[in-house]
Amino acid sequence: MRECCPDSDAGTKFKVVVHTRELRLDVFRDGKLYKSYPVAVGKPETPTPKGEFTIVNKDGTPGPRFGARWLGLSAPHIGIHGTNHPQSIGRAVSEGCVRLYNPDIEELYWMLPIGTPVTII
């Protein structure tokens, strides 16, 4: 059985930037762009909050509404998670969370430790 929340690489510094207009999530590793992922963000009536946050919790079995994994942010009731509606990726359709394809959130779940900074712009 794998650990819940391993540090991906001791000493490696990660940062996440979510671009709500471009519908993209970028991961920076030690200050350099490492990976980019397409996302869905909040719809106009429930926009994704902008600002500086951190990953405060992780859930490996969040239930069908949140896809394969959940990365909870320091913003109340907001997270980065998977989806069982892959057709929603690339659109502004969520209740404020950031959605990714399930294989992408699986990768981020194991890559990003709790405490990782997340900027949403």
What is the predicted function of each stretch?
Residues R2-K13, K43, P47-F53, N57-I121:
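Exported/periplasmic cell-wall-interacting domains
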Residues R2-K43:
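A structural motif detector for short, solvent-exposed N-terminal "entry" segments of globular domains
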